[in-house]
């Protein structure tokens, strides 16, 4: 059962700094963005680690106890699936590098694997990707005026349905 979903935005990139639409262009984090995700990753990892410790302190019966034949058994599945972990955590991210950098800042601290999924990519801005708003206005003023209709790109609702 899923009891919590947390979505994070990646840290800053050079395109963010230049106010460019990056969409699905694979731009890595800049040094500030890496610092941002390191801070966020540490805070999240601390939150989940201490939440787990507190749950186990309140409910010590949740700690998996080996049965009498444990020393002779080689099947570890029952212990891997035991509730001692408190909750099963899954870290999923877009396949874009900036998103992977962000996910790993959290997951690596807790020793969790990161699963990449292209469907989690940012919204597509079509041919406007990599351009600033001023550049878009200069070459496509009429199209820019219809920005709210997202002509030539993916709508916000398209992103929501993918996520």
List PLM regions with ranges.
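Phosphate-handling substructures
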Residues: 108-163
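Extreme N-terminal starter segment of soluble prokaryotic enzymes
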Residues: 1-6, 89-90
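N-terminal hydrophobic or amphipathic segments with adjacent small-residue motifs
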Residues: 5, 17-20, 27, 120, ...
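Active-site-proximal alpha-helix that buttresses catalytic centers in soluble enzyme cores
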Residues: 14-112
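Active-site metal-binding loops of divalent metal-dependent hydrolases
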Residues: 11
């Amino acid at each position: 059962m899923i009891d919590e979903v947390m979505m994070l935005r990646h840290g800053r990139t050079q395109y963010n700094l230049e106010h460019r639409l990056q969409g699905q262009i694979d731009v890595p984090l800049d040094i500030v963005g890496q610092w941002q995700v390191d801070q966020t990753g540490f805070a999240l990892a601390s939150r989940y680690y201490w939440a787990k410790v507190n749950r186990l302190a309140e409910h010590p019966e949740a700690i998996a106890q080996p049965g009498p034949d444990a020393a002779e058994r080689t099947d570890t599945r029952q212990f891997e699936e035991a509730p001692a972990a408190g909750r099963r955590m899954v870290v999923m991210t877009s396949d874009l590098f900036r998103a992977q950098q962000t996910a790993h800042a959290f997951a690596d601290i807790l020793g969790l694997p990161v699963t990449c999924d292209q469907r989690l990519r940012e919204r597509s801005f079509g041919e406007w990707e990599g351009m600033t708003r001023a550049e878009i206005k200069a070459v496509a003023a009429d199209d820019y005026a219809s920005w709210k209709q997202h002509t030539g790109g993916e709508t916000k609702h398209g992103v929501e349905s993918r996520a």
